[in-house]
Amino acid sequence: QRIANGEIGDIINIQTTEHVSYHHLSTSYVRGKWANSDKCHTTMLLAKCCHDMDMMMWMMSETTPTQISSFGSKYQFRPENAPEGAGTICMRDCPHVDTCVYSTKRLYIDHPDRWSFYVWDALEHLDNPTIEDKIALMKTDNPYARCIYKCDNNVVDHQSVLVNFKSGATGTHNMVGGSAEPRRNIHIVGTKGEIFGNFEESKFTVLKIN
């Protein structure tokens, strides 16, 4: 509304960033259902950040994109980055099960309610699965039991997008996976001021040029 009211003038640049937490990234985009584009038929950016890009386009609705460039990679979760001697199933054959921050024991057994609707899907036939049931599942070939570095993931774990608009304005979006906590930030700079904020905190600041 403040943008529509012209409080910060014409938009020069929009910067948005989504920090995907380490436990969300590993569960959904490395071990889980959106980890492999050949199976889920979508990309990481579309699966996780389509709302961020929609929001940017909505705020820039007075103009249209003319150029888009994007770069990203599967930087972190690759076999060559696994700790020395790492197994393939964390709780079955890995000596790092108690120390690796991505081990299924630390992510799912120590926090059994974390992403439970994904991780414990194979136990939905049980009315009230016990911790013993969950431990047993994490010793099988279940996708969520795998070593984080030895999955069939092929989507990026970080990506940057740069948009050039017809008006001359620019926009950037950064998706960074593996952060300590989830965060969505935005910073909009206009000819008369700027707005920046954090969506998790529902806190936004307006600065005006005096």
Regions found by a protein language model. Give the residues of each.
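Glycine-enriched catalytic-core subsegment of oxygenase/oxidase enzymes
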Residues: 141-210
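Predominantly a Rossmann-like dinucleotide-binding segment in NAD(P)-dependent oxidoreductases
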Residues: 1-138, 144
